[in-house]
Amino acid sequence: MARDPKHDILFEPIQIGPKTLRNRFYQVPHCIGAGSDKPGFQSAHRSVKAEGGWAALNTEYCSINPESDDTHRLSARIWDEGDVRNLKAMTDEVHKYGALAGVELWYGGAHAPNMESRATPRGPSQYASEFETLSYCKEMDLSDIAQVQQFYVDAAKRSRDAGFDIVYVYGAHSYLPLQFLNPYYNKRTDKYGGSLENRARFWLETLEKVKHAVGSDCAIATRFGVDTVYGPGQIEAEVDGQKFVEMADSLVDMWDITIGDIAEWGEDAGPSRFYQQGHTIPWVKLVKQVSKKPVLGVGRYTDPEKMIEIVTKGYADIIGCARPSIADPFLPQKVEQGRYDDIRVCIGCNVCISRWEIGGPPMICTQNATAGEEYRRGWHPEKFRQTKNKDSVLIVGAGPSGSEAARVLMESGYTVHLTDTAEKIGGHLNQVAALPGLGEWSYHRDYRETQITKLLKKNKESQLALGQKPMTADDVLQYGADKVIIATGARWNTDGTNCLTHDPIPGADASLPDQLTPEQVMDGKKKIGKRVVILNADTYFMAPSLAEKLATAGHEVTIVSGVHLANYMHFTLEYPNMMRRLHELHVEELGDHFCSRIEPGRMEIYNIWGDGSKRTYRGPGVSPRDANTSHRWIEFDSLVLVTGRHSECTLWNELKARESEWAENDIKGIYLIGDAEAPRLIADATFTGHRVAREIEEANPQIAIPYKRETIAWGTPHMPGGNFKIEYKV
């Protein structure tokens, strides 16, 4: 199928200095948890996107010196020849597919905690990081400035040696160049502080030095936070931003534009809960107005129509993407081939980002279960090993895990029967996507629905059976399938069982008229009173989402939370605006409080720290702490129990108890996946469905086969002349 001619503009080549982008699709620098220490992961993840048609692939932020060490998080590094060797694996693989490779040179100032190197970071002035804990920098004198600028030059030369085509001076997200430019950080009174011209001096000099060193071989880019979105007192696009672009335009070959700062970089990597694609256009277009160089901006671009609007209206020249490239590494190729309904659209949940925020474990993706698994498991997002046997597979449950398993199995040539009691695939995601701001999460369901519909046309023996009665163990055993996958999901606890006490709460019972589970709130069938209390022991989105839904509908909402409310939303960058939203709606929170018992219309709550700080051994059967005297009663008209989830695995348990009957019914194996195995993130539920489907022919698909680990082996020196002998300097 040919692409629509109006999209031809997206495939025009773009010249950036001495290099040429083959089209306008550009993967901006983004973290994956590979850095320089996992070259297989780094090269495989970036190169599969090069295969998918992206014009350029960048590393994550890449440290130029041990003074810029982001441990506990995992960045790339280009400190020495060992890093050059490891990163060259990426550039070599990317070049095989005709794409350019870029590196983002990073010096963090006080935002680099240096937990591994224990070096002292330097900055324009001495300040404490608002992002890191107990991290201060040394104010740079003139010799410090010259030395750090040389760090950039040396790193740029190593980058060229590693095969990189594009070299960034990273000045977004409150890192060193922007710290000099921003009066929020820069309190200097010498030639590097005060006026805009002085505050810009460090950045301009650094660009000039890097360009002189490698500019004939590499395109020079800078990532610029054109507006910190705090208003006066920091960087504003039409006050300082545009003027700086005019100052630096001759020194760069391409502008990569962001907004926001390090403390709230979710203003740039906007979650779909709060921001639609293209949300940064009002700022990016201001740069395009004054620059003579190619300009790119990000905005979770997934729709080709939005992409051509950006180019034809002159907002930007290049479509910058991070999250959309993770969700679908073959997005450019699918647009080029006119396969628009095959695009795996990023849902904007920011679970990919959460892994970096947590500290750098391998990146995952809710939409694309192969993300991060390209090297270690050998998974390709568009290629599947074709089965040589004729096994049929019954999948009970068409939620995120079951529908993903069905898709992968059908792609691999199996006959699949996917069944569910609901009228639509998606499982609990159908309710979740109806919560405020989460509509785009339904793209997860839509992609699988579209692909399964297509695959059913190819394999006439496969079936999708929705709106069915619940299957019993007898139904499964007598169905006639060779293999069975149970994907019956999870539900919220009706009795208040929670992570704090691991027991039900006396009086908790969602069958009562004044108590509800989240599912009951979302399905809207049960009457909800004016005064609502949400009892929370969940650390993700459910309690604040229900609070927003109910408060918007006119209810008076109080959240009683025994855990840090919405803690995981810190990692997905949703937390600041979620808290602002609850404040706007006058939602009250009683943090560090939980419930001891419930009676009609009221609940007894207590401060979880109310048992005192002193501990004394008092013998068996007696608490070593004092009695908690903080108990008090609060009233409600309706109580929502957001205390925990449990797997709906009754069918699995019944089948497992009758395992001796499997063989006599010609069943080779029955497997449990997704939330039915254990409640988890949608991304992880999707992954388990994908994994079991990929490994369905293994001896026991329930247990994952070992993946390739990238480790430093004893006796393999990382640096030239290095060794792994234990030697003490005495």
UniProtKB/Swiss-Prot annotation:
GO biological process: catabolic process
GO molecular function list: 4 iron, 4 sulfur cluster binding; FMN binding; metal ion binding; trimethylamine dehydrogenase activity
Residues annotated as binding ADP: S401, D420, T421, H428, M471, D675
Keyword Oxidoreductase: yes
CDD domains in alphabetical order: TMADH_HD_FMN (cd02929)
Necessary cofactors: FMN; [4Fe-4S] cluster
Keyword ATP-binding recorded: no
Active-site residue numbers: Y175
Subunit architecture: Homodimer. Forms a ternary complex with the heterodimeric electron transfer flavoprotein.
Protein name per its UniProtKB record: Trimethylamine dehydrogenase
